[in-house]
């Protein structure tokens, strides 16, 4: 037997008021939805009262309908804004929970550091570029003709034995005249780029050739079998030793400061005539200001110009070479060549602030 529904205006009004009060006090969406189910769901007093209107006398139905419409509207006006409020609060809480606290300490990944040697070589290149010279890298595996013969080293010249050259087994190359028969070597000096550059670029020529060279030295505090040089070559009309000295002085100032200066001492190199040892003076030398040997230089030997098909009666030139490792040792506190080749990042980090 179906339950008889009775319309009780006071009871339904009280229950709706109770539901509205609970809506106002709800603290989360789950609680709010439960209140809606209790006070506006299928089994709620409001729903039952609405159904009971049909059993009322005709003269009471109109007033009962108005009352139920008002109660539903009151309940909805309380529920809607509260639902929006609690949804916004839930979204803010979720965003706050996902926020990264930037003040928390993090595990930083260690940073590397540039090795001081390539940085020094860039500084040297920048110096020559600032004067309008070109940079020529040359070849590390080179024809013996370019490394020795074209530079006025005779077949039995003592320098060939003294430098203990690495020869590349089973390979031969063409010399400048196109004749096959020149052995391939791992270059012992960046001077090997001189005649090749003259042949390919022509004159006038102003180049700097920084790069690696290779000799059979044992690695110790002052030697390494792989090291770096920078060779500079200028060939033009009317060049003299005065031009050479001017460039050397400017390079010394660029590398060692405004008080640095150079001097030349007579020497001998097959590819220059006259030749000179290049000495450097600068105030920050270890042990106090003084002179140190820095490199070699001289006027290009006429035989070298002839190797490139250039008339030495028309053109003259000068050349000089300095060791990059030696330059770095002179202008820093490095005392052992091992530090330059062992790849310890702690060593490179010492030079970061100077970049």
Curated annotation (Swiss-Prot):
Family matches, as NCBIfam families: pheS
Cofactor binding, per record: Binds 2 magnesium ions per tetramer.
Repeat as UniProt keyword: no
Catalytic activity entry: tRNA(Phe) + L-phenylalanine + ATP = L-phenylalanyl-tRNA(Phe) + AMP + diphosphate + H(+)
EC number, UniProt record: 6.1.1.20
Keyword Membrane: no
Residues bound to Mg(2+): 273
Predominant location: cytoplasm
Cofactor(s) essential for the protein: Mg(2+)
Keywords per UniProt: Aminoacyl-tRNA synthetase, ATP-binding, Cytoplasm, Ligase, Magnesium, Metal-binding, Nucleotide-binding, Protein biosynthesis
Entry's family note: Belongs to the class-II aminoacyl-tRNA synthetase family. Phe-tRNA synthetase alpha subunit type 1 subfamily.
Protein name: Phenylalanine--tRNA ligase alpha subunit
Compartment(s): Cytoplasm
Quaternary structure and partners: Tetramer of two alpha and two beta subunits.
InterPro entries per UniProt: aa-tRNA-synth_II (IPR006195), aa-tRNA-synth_II/BPL/LPL (IPR045864), Phe-tRNA-synth_IIc_asu (IPR004529), Phe-tRNA_ligase_II_N (IPR004188), Phe_tRNA_ligase_alpha1_bac (IPR022911), Phenylalanyl-tRNA_Synthase (IPR002319), tRNA-bd_arm (IPR010978)
Gene Ontology CC, one term: cytoplasm
One record GO biological process: phenylalanyl-tRNA aminoacylation
GO molecular function, one term: magnesium ion binding
